[in-house]
From Swiss-Prot:
<dbReference type="Pfam" id="PF21882">
    <property type="entry name" value="Gp53-like_C"/>
</dbReference>
<protein>
    <recommendedName>
        <fullName>Putative uncharacterized protein YfdL</fullName>
    </recommendedName>
</protein>
<dbReference type="InterPro" id="IPR054075">
    <property type="entry name" value="Gp53-like_C"/>
</dbReference>
<comment type="similarity">
    <text>To E.coli StfP and M.jannaschii MJ0347.</text>
</comment>
Length: 172
């Protein structure tokens, strides 16, 4: 009776019984129990997915999708960076940080500076600072419309013409 049951296990795996082979039962069990036709399907059918995840030590992050929405995990493409000057950093939240030089003319006049990339919605704030060359005795200031909503540019004016300046802008 036991031999018949063992033979039926081998036959259920699709193998034919051979008297000279001594690994038929093991081969049949592997074929039947370790099938890759529906990996982990038995766990789902048993309703033990949560227990399997606990046994594997997988936390909540393993169940999240990749993206920038709520309850998603951002991939590195969500942190775009152009580290040049001018440059920018995009964050998964949609916030964009931009920086670069301001070309201050030799006469006191308004200067239009374009951002490295357009903000998709609007500029939230621009910070401008005039540079200083040690030993030059030239200390200046620069001002701009800090709460600028233009997504592509801002306007500034330097107190001392010809001295370099730079900006830092936040937008979304």
């Amino acid at each position: 009776m036991l031999q018949e049951e063992l033979c039926s296990v081998v036959e259920a795996s699709g193998a034919s019984l051979e008297k000279g082979r001594h690994d038929q039962l093991l081969t049949a069990l592997r074929a039947l129990l370790l099938s890759r036709k529906n990996p982990f399907g038995d766990i789902k059918l048993d309703g033990t997915v949560q227990k399997a995840l606990e046994n594997l030590g997988l936390g909540e992050a393993a169940k999240r999708n990749v993206g920038t929405g709520a309850n998603q995990i951002p991939d590195m493409g969500s942190f775009m960076l152009s580290a040049s000057v001018p440059g920018y950093q995009k964050l998964p939240s949609g916030l964009i940080i931009q920086w670069g030089p301001i070309d201050v003319p030799l006469t006191s006049q308004d200067t239009v500076t374009y951002f490295p990339i357009a903000f998709p919605n609007r500029c939230l704030r621009v910070f401008a600072t005039q540079d200083y060359t040690p030993g030059s005795a030239n200390v200046g200031y620069i001002a701009c419309a800090g709460y600028n909503q233009d997504p592509v540019k801002f306007i500034s004016r330097a107190g001392v013409p010809g001295i370099g300046a730079s900006f830092f802008a936040l937008g979304c």
